[in-house]
Curated annotation (Swiss-Prot):
Belongs to the bacterial ribosomal protein bL20 family. This is Large ribosomal subunit protein bL20. NCBIfam families: rplT_bact (TIGR01032). InterPro entries: Ribosomal_bL20, RIBOSOMAL_L20_CS, Ribosomal_protein_bL20_C. It comes from the Bacteria. Pfam families: Ribosomal_L20. Binds directly to 23S ribosomal RNA and is necessary for the in vitro assembly process of the 50S ribosomal subunit. It is not involved in the protein synthesizing functions of that subunit. Keywords: Ribonucleoprotein, Ribosomal protein, RNA-binding, rRNA-binding. The keyword Ribosomal protein applies. GO terms for biological process: ribosomal large subunit assembly; translation. One of its GO terms (cellular component) is ribosome. It comes from Helicobacter pylori (strain HPAG1). CDD domains: Ribosomal_L20. The keyword Transferase does not apply.
Amino acid sequence: MRVKTGVVRRRRHKKVLKLARGFYSGRRKHFRKAKEQLERSMYYAFRDRKQKKREFRSLWVVRINAACRMHNTSYSRFMHALKVANIELDRKVLADMAMNDMQAFKSVLESVKEHL
């Protein structure tokens, strides 16, 4: 009997099983289970790339708010004052300042103090 998909099937299986490394038990060793788990993992990866952006933004907000409250103001008032003072620093930079360079964050806070 002639096998028409011998090389092609081997390559396809090899590719799927290579991508399934690190999965648990049969999901790593058996082609069908590996393929199903791979589809699910690709779905998770796609979904979580979007979720990651939301999670980081909320983390930055929490950090900025904590730093603001140390200086007796709130996050919302601080962000409004930044907008009024026409200072265009994004939340990522502000959160990094709040965590690693408190002096710089304090100077930004002082510069918008009149707009609070």
